Amino acid sequence: MKKYQRMHLIFIRQYIKQIMEYKVDFVVGVLGVFLTQGLNLLFLNVIFQHIPSLEGWSFQEIAFIYGFSLIPKGLDHLFFDNLWALGQRLVRKGEFDKYLTRPINPLFHILVETFQIDALGELLVGGILLATTVSSIAWTLPKFLIFLVCIPFATLIYTSLKIATASIAFWTKQSGAMIYIFYMFNDFAKYPISIYNSALRWLISFIVPFAFTAYYPASYFLQDKDVIFNIGGLMLISLAFFVISLKLWDRGLDAYESAGS
């Protein structure tokens, strides 16, 4: 484990050095993400200028859900975004072969090879929103510790779904479109799912479970809803999807044939 931790830090340092050679691109990337999320919030604020609440949720509560959703999304984007490369080109162009010739677990290698520093824009917006809305929560030490525990489990859902959909490329040669389609559902996690119809609520809760990355844990923090379902469900679903994604990865790896073969 320590060996992999050291290697991860080495990859991060090397990638940051590469990024710093193009400082303008870095700044533009971070600002682009920051402005995108800012415009979404501005639009939401305009809506609340005309209505007092949305399905019983105040603007401050929805802002908390929105901010909460950006933290796990941003962490996954920051550390594990290279899975997009697997789905889009590594298998199709035969570039995945190099990962099989190195004395490193290929999944670990792909996960830590890049460091998407523009994700700092998402984390910055998420942090600001949480900092400005936490006053709406009656914090206790157990609740604060639960909050800290929720973040890695919610991040794991993002990463697991990307591992699973990227692994489809082992059979189809590319799966970038599938990753994108699944990833689009994360936008629904930024808002209370009670505003959606029952079919969509079920879909984003148990099939593409992005609702557990923000809405359900936020429901516990904001409204003291059932901790077993909202927090326990997050942990159970994230671990279940992680195991499923690893199984799919292993089967795909066994089925892998180089694009040149």
What does each of the following model-derived ranges do?
Residues 1-261:
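Hydrophobic transmembrane alpha-helices and immediately adjacent juxtamembrane helices
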